[in-house]
Amino acid sequence: MSPAPLEVVLLVFVLACAVGAALLEDVLAAILAFAAYSLGISVLWVFLQAPDVGLTEAAVGAGIMTILFLLAVAKTAREPSGRTLESVRWRSLVLVGAFVGVLALVLPAVPAIGDPAAPVLSYDVTQYYLANSYEETGVTNAVTAVLAAYRGLDTLGEATVVFTAAVAVLVVFDREVLT
Amino acid sequence: MSDAGQSRPPEGAAYVESTIIMTTVRLIAPFVITYGLFVMFHGADSPGGGFQGGVIVGAMVVMVGFAFGVAPAREWVKNDVLVAVATTGALTFVAVGLGAQLLGGRFLEYASYEPLYHHASKYLIELVELAIGAIVAAVVVGLYFSLARGHVGSTEEDEA
């Protein structure tokens, strides 16, 4: 299946933003490029039929993370060097190139999007969730059923991680109040 | 701030008062928090859930902080409120899990509540989503306030 024109535009946009975030010398510009990248990715998630993930990406990646980055930048001093782009080190470039090469080699082995024979679809657990999640949990969004019911313990762990983040910030900042 | 004057560098100024931003935020804030609560409540039947909804609710407070300054936002949302919301969320989640054990099931086995209330599983999942949302919203706001204030020895104790 060939990608829709909008998907191609989005992919190019995301790629350009990612390169921009990595190469732009100005931290503020890099943060904005990163936010745009995150927003593009969140729309791509919707194209990939994963609206739950897309919503998270848009809220956390493009929204809150950008604000926290901006705050951090506002709190720190940076010296304008006058250049637009960061100078690229050859070693980093070789490393990134090798990583992209490995990914490109693996990519053909990934099943096509929506392929009914894809292992993730034919796997017993997936079929079980799709067949029984409404009966057993009473919620129609299977993602929520897996998240809150079948994998509830994992989600409790996730919520604890978020809670711990606030505690960790208090410890690092040597404070007793969040505000 | 040490160079509090008119020659403040643009990157040092964390807060710029703007009537447009304040009016816009005042207008859209109720809609943002409503949408956040919708995403939290409706996560069982549509995309969304506690994590996403919590971030959106937290973003509402962050928006107010951006528009009106961090100090007024701090006055508005007290530390006690944030801590209470986050811990209530965490304790609710654990209580739902332990309650199932008290009723003879396993930890977080919603089905064991079924004799008490029909469709218990669905409502408990909603409750758990709300608990997650409470944790996430409070932590997002807390991270924002903490980052805005900085380290205890920082020279920029209160900027806004």
Sequence positions of predicted segments:
Chain A
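Alpha-helical transmembrane segments of multi-pass membrane proteins predominantly involved
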Residues: M1-T179
